[in-house]
Regions:
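Secretory targeting signatures
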Residues: 1-2, 52, 253-254
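An accessory alpha-helical subdomain
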Residues: 143-156, 160-232
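Secondary-structure boundary/capping motif
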Residues: 14-17, 48, 73, 221
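Proline/glycine-rich low-complexity loops and linkers
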Residues: 34-41, 48-51, 58, 63, ...
Length: 254
């Protein structure tokens, strides 16, 4: 499964809010074997959101959209997703019932809360509603597009409710080495060409090591590539910061 992430919000583009949703979702999807191919942040502009959703829905197996749900003027995501699929917004009975239950439960704490329930409970026609157990605004699933709130706690709770719908065949292995990145280039090219796996090197200067991540849809090739690197690269244990392997050709006899 291939996926794209679309995060919505002027505050993200301005740097006022850290885009933790993209990082969290990318990690969760990758752990499920999903290949995240694109991460895009768009402003609170209906046309920009609709264009991104339309393009990615055609190109990828799944699209996850976060942010822009609610009752404020800049909350345009549901309108944009509906437009991307040439649908209207319709009040959803399940979403309305959940909103009414939630509002009843919090009315004593927020007596002046004024919510347009019909607008809040409206999702693209024919969409599947996603109930918000941690907040107000419902999400929705429209064909292969999943729409979640932008508040991290609400987004994570909603994602967990549909997490089983995301599954892929991409597996990964991670190794750590104290060797300089520049010294690894030839061996990383070799393992990529020999075994047909994807490999990346990610420096962690604070820890004093490099993280090597191998990815493939073929578990056998991945195991072979990992075993080859274990023989060719000096590895370390990132927790103990001790060497766990020797590079071929090194003489440790004293």
């Amino acid at each position: 499964m291939d996926a794209a992430l679309v995060t919505v919000g002027d505050e993200l583009l301005a740097g006022d809010t850290e885009n933790t949703n993209a990082t969290w979702l990318a990690r969760e999807l990758t752990e499920r074997g999903v290949a995240v191919k694109r991460v895009l942040t768009v402003p609170d502009v209906e046309g920009a959101i609709a264009d991104a959703v339309r393009e990615y829905a055609d190109r990828y197996d799944a699209v996850v959209v976060t942010g822009g749900l609610g009752g404020t003027p800049d909350d345009l995501t549901m309108d944009a997703v509906a437009a991307a699929f040439d649908r209207s917004l319709e009040e959803n009975d399940l979403a309305r019932a959940d909103l009414e239950r939630t509002l009843k439960a919090i009315t004593d704490s927020y007596p002046d809360l004024n919510v347009d329930i019909e607008a809040e409970a409206s999702i693209p026609a024919g969409a599947r509603p996603l109930i918000n157990d941690a907040g107000l605004s419902p999400g929705a699933v429209v064909e292969n597009v999943y729409v979640f709130p932008g508040i991290p706690g609400e987004m994570q709770r909603m994602f967990e409710g549909v997490a089983d719908e995301f599954a892929g065949d991409v597996d990964s292995r991670v190794l750590y080495t104290s060797e300089p990145e520049a010294n690894l280039i030839e061996r990383l090219d070799a393992v990529r060409n020999r075994f047909g796996v994807l490999v990346g090197c990610y420096p962690d200067r604070a820890a004093g090591h490099n993280r090597l991540k191998l990815r493939s849809e073929d578990p056998g090739k991945l195991d072979e590539a990992t075993a080859w690197l274990r023989e060719e690269v000096r590895l370390v244990d990132p927790d103990a910061d001790t060497q766990v392997g020797e590079a071929v050709g090194e003489d440790d006899s004293g």
